[in-house]
Amino acid sequence: MKRTFVLAVSILFVFVSIGAIVSSADKSKTYYVCNCQDDCKCNFVANKPGKCNCGTNLAAMHVLAIEKGLGIFCRCGADCSCERSKSDPGKCGCGKSVKTVGLKGKYVCDCGPGCNCGTISEKPGKCHCGKDLKQVS
């Protein structure tokens, strides 16, 4: 019974954390996103620097838009203040290609109720804190 309660509270926290990441997305917030290739399917997003499950360093990006469960990120870096291009939605105002990341994460950090990692990934692996990512079903 206690284990079920702890699991339920953990899952609730995960959904609240995901909602906080999505709802608090603003253009001044720096996110750390896997940027291994243009066809990268890692969908790894965190609020702290580190490495993706594929081994690539996470790149500092800011969110341009959130659309239909996808985060659209500017690849210009943490200090960028670009807007999304009005003439080409696949680019930011500076002309660089945007990075699209699915935010409906299948794997999240399993630190527990006090978790501040904010790690979301499409693949199993390790969080930046060293804990295993847990599949949300």
Where are the predicted features?
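N-terminal export/membrane-targeting signals
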Residues: 1-25
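Intrinsically disordered, low-complexity terminal tails/loops enriched in metal-binding residues
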Residues: 20-137
